[in-house]
Curated annotation (Swiss-Prot):
Organism: Arabidopsis thaliana (Mouse-ear cress)
Pfam entry (one): CAAD
Residues modified to N-acetylalanine: A63
Bilayer disposition of the protein: Multi-pass membrane protein
The gene coding this protein: CURT1A
UniProt protein name: Protein CURVATURE THYLAKOID 1A, chloroplastic
Record field: transmembrane: 94-114, 117-137
């Protein structure tokens, strides 16, 4: 008898109480069923309050009947083929491309090794933060230094393009 009284009293404690009147509101979005024939799509939002449910139109999008693509894949492939056929030293391009892939692979190995050392990643973060602060102070903080940076970038562009 004592066990049943203890069990019933513990069950009474474990059952949560729900207030009879809820005064809070919550927004619960739901997904409507898919309709393929519609030209517009509205996402309704149900607001739950003590008085009842209210529907609010949140977002309305319209589907376009024409399909436009900013990049045509056939045009891109033909353009790449024309540029590849126009190259004289194809082996040089392949060597540089392979070298770039190997360089990225090796740099990822080095970064992984640095991250495995316990204190070194934090030191590298501090070095990067210090360099960023120096760069902002040296080139971005004052108007004259921003002009100097723009001139340096333009001269570098000319050197790379071969017009200087």
């Amino acid at each position: 008898m004592a066990i049943s009284v203890a069990a019933s009293s513990s069950m009474a404690v474990m059952v949560p109480r729900v207030p009879a009147v809820s005064t809070r509101c919550s927004a619960v979005p739901y997904l409507p069923p898919r309709s393929f024939g519609r030209s517009s799509f509205t996402v309704p939002l149900k607001l739950v309050s003590g008085n009842g449910l209210q529907k609010v139109e949140l977002l309305k999008t319209r589907a376009s009947s024409e399909e436009t693509s900013s990049i045509d894949t056939n045009e891109l492939i033909t353009d790449l083929k024309e540029k590849w056929d126009g190259l004289e030293n194809k082996s040089t391009v392949l060597i540089y491309g392979g070298g770039a892939i190997v360089a990225v692979w090796l740099s990822s190995i080095v970064v992984g090794a640095i991250n495995s050392v316990p204190l070194l990643p934090k030191v590298m973060e501090l070095v990067g933060l210090g360099y960023t602060g120096w760069f902002v102070y040296r080139y971005l903080l004052f108007k004259s230094s921003r002009k100097e940076l723009a001139e340096d970038i333009e001269s570098l562009k000319k050197k790379i393009a071969g017009s200087e």
